[in-house]
């Protein structure tokens, strides 16, 4: 089965709550079929049998974590919620470490002869790491050739000599890049061989029976946790309990303002079908994916602001340069509060989150960096 089909099957649902899709076939001209269909519809439910358990770790900085392996994968596979603490995003540390230490006896290939999903992910992570190293090597090689050209110019070289040297350098860089591409697979195989050797510190990862300790957990952003308990009844805590963990009961509006604004933005894009992930990697609040990280790169970087806040040009230009360098679109998301601060904090303390979040209005502006050489019209 191809990678695309595997992902389509694995990430079938965009949210942890699934639609009711086990209803019987409806025969239009048969009244009994209508009655049976209505009965099954009335009895069906899409509520989770066992809600996801979360733990709160830390005093000064609160970490909201999910410890159970199955629940971690469930949240990731159904909406890409959370981040593995020892992984890039999906919590794959356990599978990667078991494979490296030879603890997993499950065959890595399925009946079709293709690689399993776990092995594919491990290979991709290794390839990504290797490509980062190769990019550094390529930059060093390019800088070396640029120094040669600079030396020629300092010596007063003729223009024809420069052209000949430039052509040689371009050809040298092409061959260097081609060699790097061929070396990716070889290096990955060498890593597989070298990683099979146990290190001294690996003994600390195993319990008395030789099984891998469950060290990795899935960490949720506060806004993700609120969404999974307020918008969707997925977590085993209530919105009021979560709010009490995040802020003290006597909190002022200025204490909760940043969180409320961030959640309003998060809920806004989730409700429009976007997969929302943390954007700290690109200096913004959120990244927006059409489906999720396994399918394509994020298209938009979102920065949340109050509707009456204006930054200087340097602030906008700095973020736009980072976002533009990653080939993404920069979105300024302005949030306006429609009620007073006193009313907002009163709604928060009374746990009336529905009315509180509905009292904010969201507006968006696409920011595009103006380049004189490209924007002449």
Curated annotation (Swiss-Prot):
InterPro entries: tRNA_endonuc-like_dom_sf, tRNA_intron_Endo_cat-like_sf, tRNA_intron_Endonuc_cat-like, tRNA_splic, tRNA_splic_SEN2. One of its GO terms (cellular component) is tRNA-intron endonuclease complex. It is found in: Nucleus; Endomembrane system; Mitochondrion outer membrane. Keywords: Coiled coil, Lyase, Membrane, Mitochondrion, Mitochondrion outer membrane, Nucleus, tRNA processing. It comes from the Eukaryota. GO terms for biological process: tRNA processing; tRNA-type intron splice site recognition and cleavage. GO terms for molecular function: lyase activity; nucleic acid binding; tRNA-intron endonuclease activity. It is a peripheral membrane protein. The keyword Mitochondrion applies. CDD domains: tRNA-intron_lyase_C (cd22363). Its EC number is 4.6.1.16. Pfam families: tRNA_int_endo. Changing residue 292 to E: In the cold-sensitive allele sen2-3; defective in cleavage only at the 5'-splice site of tRNA precursors. The active site is at 289, 297, 328. The tRNA splicing endonuclease complex is present with 100 molecules/cell. Present with 319 molecules/cell in log phase SD medium. NCBIfam families: endA. Heterotetramer composed of SEN2, SEN15, SEN34 and SEN54. Interacts directly with SEN54. This is tRNA-splicing endonuclease subunit SEN2.
């Amino acid at each position: 089965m191809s990678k695309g089909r595997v992902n389509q099957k694995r990430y079938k649902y965009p949210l942890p709550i699934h639609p009711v899709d086990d209803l019987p076939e409806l025969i239009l001209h048969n009244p009994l079929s209508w009655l049976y269909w209505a009965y099954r519809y009335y009895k069906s439910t899409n509520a989770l049998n066992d809600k996801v358990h979360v733990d709160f770790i830390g005093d000064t900085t609160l970490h909201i974590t999910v410890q159970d392996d199955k629940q971690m994968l469930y949240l990731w596979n159904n909406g890409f919620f959370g981040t593995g603490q020892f992984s890039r995003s999906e919590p794959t540390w356990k599978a990667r470490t078991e494979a490296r230490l030879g603890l997993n006896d499950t065959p890595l290939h399925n009946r079709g002869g293709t690689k399993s999903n776990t092995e594919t992910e491990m290979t991709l992570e290794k390839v990504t790491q290797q490509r980062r190293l190769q990019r550094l090597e390529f930059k060093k090689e390019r800088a070396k050739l640029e120094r040669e050209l600079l030396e020629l110019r300092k010596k007063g070289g003729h223009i024809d000599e420069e052209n000949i040297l430039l052509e040689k350098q371009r050809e040298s860089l092409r061959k260097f890049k081609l060699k790097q591409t061929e070396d990716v697979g070889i290096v990955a195989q060498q890593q597989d061989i070298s990683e099979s050797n146990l290190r001294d510190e690996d003994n600390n990862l195993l319990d008395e029976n030789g099984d891998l300790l469950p060290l990795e957990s899935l960490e949720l952003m506060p806004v993700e946790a609120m969404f999974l308990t307020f918008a969707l009844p997925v977590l085993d805590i209530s919105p009021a309990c979560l709010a009490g963990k995040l802020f003290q009961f006597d909190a002022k509006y200025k204490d909760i303002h940043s969180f409320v604004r961030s959640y309003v933005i998060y809920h806004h894009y989730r409700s429009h079908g976007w997969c929302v992930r943390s954007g700290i990697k690109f200096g913004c609040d959120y990244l927006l994916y059409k489906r999720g990280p396994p399918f394509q790169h994020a298209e938009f970087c979102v920065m949340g602001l109050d509707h009456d806040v204006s930054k200087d040009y340097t602030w906008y230009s700095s973020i736009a340069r980072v976002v533009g360098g990653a080939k993404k679109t920069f979105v300024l998301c302005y949030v306006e509060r429609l009620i007073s601060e006193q009313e907002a904090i009163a709604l928060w303390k009374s746990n009336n989150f529905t009315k509180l979040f509905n009292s904010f209005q969201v507006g968006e502006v696409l920011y595009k960096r103006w380049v004189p050489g490209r924007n002449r019209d």
